[in-house]
């Protein structure tokens, strides 16, 4: 792991502002599919297994404490946006990136829901079109060997969202990137990691040299208590480290002075 200073802070309208605002609140083919499901269906299709396992992440806890000894840059995203509608995916593809790695809950869908959040569906469709469908879901429940050994959760997500779910052995931020590189057929630094959690999604992507994109959670309603508390702690420390001048790791395909161009104040789609 490394801490690489950069000439400018991570791109966002202001990462520190984004974090503080949040704290104030409580290579496969894919096409997105819109599903008409009610809140009742959302509740009935929620995974009890996922609810239990999200309360504790030993790899995330271990990384959090290690950051106090250095390498705080691992928790800082290259791009920070309200949601995926504010990111210029076509420009990122033109910069040389070859694939997208998405977290699911609170990034593309409400927690445990089996549908893409309706307001994000056009943006996701455009995003997948820009990358030729080269996207995958990387979940800390579905597809994870420990909790989904037979791939039933993964298969349900694939059928519902129309995006491949990566089968893998370790929870983010732990584990390697061999499965991702095998899936996409390219090295990890040519991939983009997108998620709403600093110490899981962003730290995992940065550990393996990906470009990292942090989005604000779609909601905190329905999240396990442990996740809510962990999120508040993450937001506090990321805002603090950013205010101290810590930057995300440098990336050869997206130098620090180019990052601002990839995030827009108004939704692109």
From Swiss-Prot:
Question: In UniProt terms, what is the effect of altering residue 105 to N?
Answer: Normal phosphatidylglycerophosphate phosphatase activity. Impaired phosphatidylglycerophosphate phosphatase activity
Q: Where is the composition biased (Low complexity)?
A: 29-46
Q: What is its main location?
A: plastid
Q: Could you cite one Gene Ontology molecular function of this protein?
A: phosphatidylglycerophosphatase activity
Write the gene name. Answer: PGPP1
Its EC number is 3.1.3.27
Q: Give the highest taxon in the source lineage.
A: Eukaryota
Q: What is this protein called?
A: Phosphatidylglycerophosphate phosphatase 1, chloroplastic
């Amino acid at each position: 792991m490394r801490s690489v200073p950069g000439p400018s802070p991570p791109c966002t309208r202001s990462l520190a502002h984004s974090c503080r605002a949040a704290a104030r609140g409580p290579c496969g083919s894919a096409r997105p599919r819109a599903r008409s499901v009610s809140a009742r269906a959302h509740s009935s299709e929620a995974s009890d297994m996922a609810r239990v396992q999200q309360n504790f992440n030993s790899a995330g806890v271990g990384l959090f404490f290690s950051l106090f000894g250095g390498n705080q840059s691992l928790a800082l995203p290259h791009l920070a946006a309200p949601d995926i509608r504010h990111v210029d995916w076509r420009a990122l593809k033109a910069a040389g990136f070859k694939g997208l790695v998405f977290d699911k809950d609170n990034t593309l869908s409400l927690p445990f829901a089996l549908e893409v959040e309706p307001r994000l569906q056009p943006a996701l469709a455009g995003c997948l079109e820009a990358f030729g469908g080269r996207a995958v879901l990387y979940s800390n429940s579905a597809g994870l060997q420990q909790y989904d050994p037979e791939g039933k959760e993964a298969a349900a997500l694939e059928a519902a969202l129309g995006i491949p779910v990566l089968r893998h052995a370790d929870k983010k931020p732990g584990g390697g990137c061999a499965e991702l590189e095998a899936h996409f057929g390219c090295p990890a630094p040519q991939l983009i990691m997108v998620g709403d959690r600093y110490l899981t999604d962003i730290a995992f992507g940065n550990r393996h040299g990906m470009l990292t994109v942090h989005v604000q959670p779609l909601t905190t309603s329905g999240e396990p208590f442990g996740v809510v508390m962990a999120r508040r702690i993450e937001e506090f420390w990321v805002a603090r480290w950013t205010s101290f001048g810590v930057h995300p790791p440098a990336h050869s395909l997206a130098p620090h002075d180019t990052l601002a161009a990839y995030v827009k104040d108004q939704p692109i789609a």
